[in-house]
């Protein structure tokens, strides 16, 4: 009966039985496991059993030590989805603006960029070039938008989920860029041909 989760408790769930039924009914079902934050050993075991792809958010990757599990060269499995950002993160440009000088230097060096304005496309490039089975980005990254285009700030109320894309954000240049990047990184799905009768 609490209004928040502070008074809640963890309860044992059906574990893999739930995912077995989902897979029986839907196949893989297009599910991506949100495996961010603190993941306990029993949850890791369940994730392995379910075999759903986990999440790799590039904004979590840039610890100047270089050993972050979110850096593309550190992915332990291709069975993951790499994101340039999510609805709960700032845009890549907004995120970069808030970094300390040392981390900014590391990000630029890692991505091979000189200017902050190059960052959103560089993020998309490394996501697409990663070994992750799935790569995702946002219209905000394609357009290079900053914090003004952020969708959600977790644990806040009032100004979330208000940002909207405009028709003019969907440009031929963006489409050509993504199409070409998808081609050169071999991420285009195979074309399904209709059988001729």
Where are these regions (language model features)?
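Catalytic cores of glycan-processing enzymes that make or break glycosidic bonds
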Residues: 1-197
